[in-house]
Amino acid sequence: MSPTLSTGNRDQRGSSRSYAFVSLASHHFTPQGKITITSSLTRKIDPGNFQGQDVVDFSPWVVLPDEDKVAFLISCRVTAKIRKSGLPQLFKTNTSRDIG
């Protein structure tokens, strides 16, 4: 289970603000078959108000649609840095999954 990280320099209205996408996909095998769960987060980053780096905590709870109702906590901490070009550079710092 690894998050995919990407960046962009325009939002839907075409402004020059940078934004970061964090997408996390996990695959679970249940008696009913394989289930793929994808969660995503979009975080806008304004280079004018951005001081060096920013940390995004991304922890969705996911309940599998099976009889046991097992809940997975998928936690992903992502740090972004603004490069000279004004785009955020993202790198993963921690990813974990807890079963509760």
Swiss-Prot record:
One cellular component (GO) term of this entry: mitochondrion
Official protein name in the record: Uncharacterized mitochondrial protein AtMg01240
Domain of life, per lineage: Eukaryota
Keyword field contains Mitochondrion: yes
Keywords: Mitochondrion
Subcellular localization, as worded in the UniProt entry: Mitochondrion
Extra facts: A stretch of 270 kb of the mitochondrial genome is duplicated within the centromere of chromosome 2 resulting in the duplication of the gene. The expression of the duplicated gene (At2g07697) is not demonstrated.
Organism: Arabidopsis thaliana (Mouse-ear cress)
